[in-house]
């Protein structure tokens, strides 16, 4: 994973943790059962089916970027084989970073709205991410470290919200947190086994 990706991931983690410290008395903890388990596995597995041909075997890598609107910024980096980086953006001043270090993995982003920032990073093999973002002034980071990890983040219709998800082999293999779309002025931190929802001050 490149140094700029590490710096961006660190910055987003620091932002989320600083919000958590400021609002520590108002933390809402959601158990793993609320966003993992059989339902997440069924939904995420069905979403993975269309991209399976791009991430099978020893094929080359695939990068696809589509942008409509004004002032968008995209960075995509793949180290490995048979991986796919797919980004679709529309709106104004949206920024996206995708980085894959490993093989047979896929990162997908569908983003619209205004002034949203998304970081997706995967280190390992056979990983999958799908992120949807709309609204304005949202910061979203999804970092996977491990193998055979898959998940979906739905942060649509949100405003001034920070969502940071860390998925490892200590997490369940399938991650699909619910209740993080349509949020306003909150920070959500997802770590193995827990999800913290914190109001921004």
Task: Annotate each predicted stretch with a short phrase.
Residues 58-60, 69-71, 80-82, 90-93, ...:
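Parallel beta-helix/beta-solenoid
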Residues 2-7, 23-60, 137-201:
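Long terminal segments
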Residues 14, 40-41, 73, 84, ...:
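Intrinsically disordered, low-complexity, compositionally biased regions/tails
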Residues 10-19:
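Bacterial N-terminal signal peptides
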Residues 25-99, 103-108:
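N-terminal targeting and processing segments
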């Amino acid at each position: 994973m490149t140094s700029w990706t590490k710096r961006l991931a660190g910055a987003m983690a620091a932002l989320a943790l600083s919000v958590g410290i400021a609002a520590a008395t108002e933390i809402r903890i959601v158990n793993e059962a609320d966003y993992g388990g059989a339902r997440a596995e069924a939904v995420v597995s069905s979403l993975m089916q269309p991209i399976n041909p791009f991430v099978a075997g020893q094929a080359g890598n695939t990068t696809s970027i589509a942008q409509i609107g004004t002032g968008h910024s995209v960075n995509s980096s793949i180290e490995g084989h048979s991986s796919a980086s797919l980004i679709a953006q529309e709106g104004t001043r949206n920024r996206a970073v995708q980085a894959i270090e490993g093989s047979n993995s896929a990162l997908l982003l569908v983003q619209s709205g205004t002034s949203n920032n998304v970081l997706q990073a995967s280190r390992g093999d056979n990983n999958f991410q799908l992120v949807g973002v709309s609204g304005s002034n949202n910061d979203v980071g999804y970092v996977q470290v491990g193998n055979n990890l898959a998940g979906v983040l739905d942060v649509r219709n949100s405003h001034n919200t920070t969502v940071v998800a860390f998925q490892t082999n200590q997490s369940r293999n399938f991650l699909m947190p619910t209740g993080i779309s349509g949020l306003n002025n909150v920070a959500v931190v997802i770590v193995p086994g827990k999800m913290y929802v914190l109001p921004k001050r």
